[in-house]
């Protein structure tokens, strides 16, 4: 530790140069350009709402699709005793 005085002088120069007014001005400018905490929170809330809406629409679409497929694929007999309404046999065979 022979050069402790020299080290302290160098440390003082570095500290003084780092705390000069133009450096602080640049830091303040940069901080002023950054969004505030309220803006960051609002962005986070909007992102969460969009993700929730997308997930809800996906779940709703899947549920509606399953219900529609279940209704569409009901088992119906295809023999002549139970003709479809569009069939001409429906006119010949009464209910």
Curated annotation (Swiss-Prot):
- Give a yes or no for keyword Ion transport in this entry: no
Name the keywords, alphabetized.
Answer: Cadmium, Cadmium resistance, Cobalt, Nickel, Plasmid
A GO BP annotation = response to cadmium ion
Name the Pfam families for this protein: CnrY
In terms of domain of life, where is this protein from? Answer: Bacteria
In its keyword annotation, does this UniProt entry include Transmembrane helix? no
Question: Known InterPro entries for this protein?
Answer: CnrY (IPR035230)
Recorded family membership: To A.eutrophus CnrY.
What does this protein do, in the record's words?
Component of the NCC cation-efflux system that confers resistance to nickel, cobalt and cadmium. May be involved in the regulation of NCC.
Q: What is this protein called?
A: Nickel-cobalt-cadmium resistance protein NccY
What is the organism of origin for this protein?
Alcaligenes xylosoxydans xylosoxydans (Achromobacter xylosoxidans)
Task: Identify the coding gene.
Answer: nccY
């Amino acid at each position: 530790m022979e050069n402790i005085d020299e080290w302290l002088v160098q440390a003082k120069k570095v500290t003084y140069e780092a705390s000069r007014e133009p450096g602080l001005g640049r830091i303040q400018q940069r901080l002023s350009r950054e969004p505030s905490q309220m803006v960051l929170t609002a962005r986070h809330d909007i992102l969460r709402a969009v993700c929730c809406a997308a997930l809800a629409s996906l779940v709703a679409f899947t549920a509606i699709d399953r219900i529609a497929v279940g209704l569409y694929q009901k088992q119906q007999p295809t023999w002549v005793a139970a003709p479809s309404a569009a069939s001409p046999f429906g006119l010949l065979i009464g209910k």
